Swiss-Prot record:
Pfam families: HD, HD_assoc. It comes from Pelagibacter ubique (strain HTCC1062). Keywords: Hydrolase. Residues 62-200 form the HD domain. GO terms for biological process: dGTP catabolic process. Belongs to the dGTPase family. Type 2 subfamily. GO terms for molecular function: dGTPase activity. The keyword Hydrolase applies. This is Deoxyguanosinetriphosphate triphosphohydrolase-like protein. The keyword Hydrolase applies. It comes from the Bacteria. NCBIfam families: dGTP_triPase, PRK01286.1-1.
Length: 371
């Protein structure tokens, strides 16, 4: 086990608004706790991952997904000697900006906002933690550490288009405390790829539960076939539920093992000795080997063909899009009926997008019925 603690973001450079340090929690632990106690995090319980929240109690929602991502990210960061609190914090926060009805809802809201700056769920997460959560007297938002803000900004890698960040958040809001040119920290990269590991594997579990495909379909992928063969004779009465759980469990474990091994190789091959080296590299350091990149591609293709493009899912997505579209223009027609003066004092269209994106599936459905 190699220790890369010298590459960890172990100390914080502070926050946008100065605060006294806690006597018993690190700045990153405070960030995590602020996220967990936020209204936006609680609402993730009733937001779609793939299946609308009303479809069943056992399907994953945004909150269960975020917790699973955080668990994977924390384990990886801890093994590498990095800041596991920060990796966990970024993972818990990464989906705060998601709309109701998943990516379909985001697409619909972006279409509504196309002439008003657009909508992006990653940047909406920043809007939430910087402006929209109201819990403190001296500032809006959660006033998270600069390292957490930086990691959320770079969830998908280095920033390619600063104009979008400026349009949706405002570069001045960061008060020159963020370096927009750097690549993301190792903790940010770990959080991002843990997101991929979690949803690729857990969507398989949910897809089988929803009977969109079965175990025989899954083991057409050689990666899963090999795992299946290693377990099928050891499961009493060939219990399929346990067998599927063991397959997903081993899949996650194998992906994490490959990721850690390949990350160590990348650190060595790129002669990464300091945080500055991490920031200056254009390509991600935390990534799969070529073998597992191919496996990931196969898994994504499988899920897209069997699940995401399933007729039932597409119908639900289209219904969700219609709800978002209707809500946007109904609220736009009478904004004062739904939003207060403080929300409307700047950009009405952005305020409507903030309002709709913060809705749960259930709230959006019920509001649509009564509007």
């Amino acid at each position: 086990m190699n220790n890369y603690s010298n590459l960890a973001l172990s100390k914080s450079k502070g926050r946008i608004f100065k605060e006294a340090n806690s006597l018993y929690r690190t700045p990153f632990q405070r960030d995590r706790d602020r996220i967990i106690h936020s209204a936006s995090f609680r609402r993730l319980k009733h937001k779609t991952q793939v299946f609308v929240n009303t479809e069943g109690d056992h399907f994953r929602t945004r909150i269960t997904h975020s917790i699973e991502v955080a668990q994977i990210a924390r384990s990886i960061a801890k093994h590498l000697g990095l800041n596991d609190d920060l990796a966990e914090t970024l993972s818990l926060a990464h989906d705060l900006g998601h709309t109701p009805f998943g990516h379909a809802g985001e697409d619909a809201l972006n279409e509504c906002m196309v002439n008003f700056g657009g909508f992006d769920h990653n940047l909406q997460t920043l809007r939430i933690v910087m402006f929209l959560e109201h819990k403190y007297l001296k500032f809006k938002g959660l006033n998270l550490t600069l390292e957490t803000l930086d990691g959320l900004l770079k969830h998908n890698g280095a920033i390619d288009d600063l104009s979008t960040v400026n349009r949706l958040i405002g570069l001045k809001s960061f008060k020159n405390k963020i370096n927009f040119n750097n690549s993301g920290s190792l903790e940010a990269q770990i959080s991002a790829i843990s997101d991929d590991i979690a949803y690729n594997n857990h969507d398989i579990q949910d897809g089988i539960r929803a009977k969109m495909f079965n175990l025989n379909d899954l083991i057409e992928i050689n990666f899963f076939k090999d795992i299946y063969k290693s377990h099928k004779n050891n499961i009493k009465n060939n219990n399929k539920d346990i067998l599927i759980y063991q397959i997903i469990r081993d899949s996650i474990d194998l992906m994490v093992r490959d990721l850690i091994k390949n990350t160590k190789n990348n650190l060595k091959n790129n002669k990464v000795k300091s945080l500055k080296d991490v920031y200056n590299l254009d390509d991600p350091i935390v990534c799969f080997s070529s073998k597992f990149l191919k496996i990931e591609k196969e898994v994504r293709f499988f899920l897209r063909s069997k699940m995401y493009n399933n007729k039932k899912v597409l119908l639900k997505n289209n219904h969700g899009k219609k709800i978002i579209n209707k809500l946007f223009y109904k609220i736009k027609n009478k904004p004062k009926k739904f939003l207060n003066d403080d929300q409307l004092k700047n950009d009405t269209n952005r305020a409507i997008a903030d309002f709709i994106s913060g809705m749960t599936d259930r709230y959006a459905i019920n509001l649509n019925k009564g509007i």
